[in-house]
């Protein structure tokens, strides 16, 4: 959500930032809507002030025994009372029109975000190479999984349709191990507090993190006013909704392992085989709530925490700074971590870490009280995958595959697998 006062103070800067996003100028339209709102507020206030003044005049007229004047004034009060609901409605409608327009506009990119229309404009930030030799060929994860019978898309399709999977046996245990490993790392070494949140949330929570209203078609509704979460970012960030925190409480750092649900409305024809793009998947999420001056530093810290997962798994990856045309709706700046996937001979996104500034905080009314009497302001919010568990499973399977179809268990995961060192390939 944008601050209309900031737009009024510097409309040219606002329009320049929208242009970087590929959008037309909107400041004039927004200021016009705000003028209507201000006019409605002024009209309602003027009517109330007139009623207050009339009450005093009526008292004076009665005291002077001027009944004719008192009757005239009371008639005007009655008229103003009759008009009041309409003035209040006009005020509410004007405020709603402005808020709805502001809510539909994406966040303003930071100055250092590279320009670009789509993913081709993204810029490599850094990379990490595994200590193991990179595989230049190999089977894809679904070929490995189906050959062992431990990854069953056919059974999932009978249960739920396309873009679902059933994992069994040691592969199911490996996915569970990955999630537990990530949580232990983030809570034990990175200072995050583990949370087990609801996966059904109200519409207000989805609005707060900006999944709604713009991305309604990408979500799964569940009954009246409930939505399945597309990411734990939604409940974790909304933990500070409608609250005023003390600056000494910041930063807050939350992590959660949850199932996530996405309709993938715009993904027709993409990644139709395998686990890369599912309607339901598990993900470890990281969320930070900070004071404004600390959010840039926290963004780099969060990125390093997500990277640590892949480094400990000894997986090759690169970090990309997303360009203005590829970053998310609520983001000021985003880093994507892309892991090497030998079966496709390419890098695929496994984590996205974003700083949102006060964009989500304004939608949630999440504030903090600054020290030394500096007043109350909006917090900054950050979110990142720490990481997507299903995609981590893909990366482990494909990067640790052996010629016989078996998969070596990374040493970091072996304690979570009861000491198991490999998942056997198909029996001949």
From Swiss-Prot:
Residues annotated for ATP binding in this entry: 262-264, 349-352
Catalytic reactions on record: tRNA(Ser) + L-serine + ATP = L-seryl-tRNA(Ser) + AMP + diphosphate + H(+); tRNA(Sec) + L-serine + ATP = L-seryl-tRNA(Sec) + AMP + diphosphate + H(+)
TM stretches of this protein: none
Top-level taxon in the UniProt lineage: Bacteria
Disulfide bridge partners, by residue number: none
Subunit structure of this chain's protein: Homodimer. The tRNA molecule binds across the dimer.
Protein name (Swiss-Prot/TrEMBL): Serine--tRNA ligase
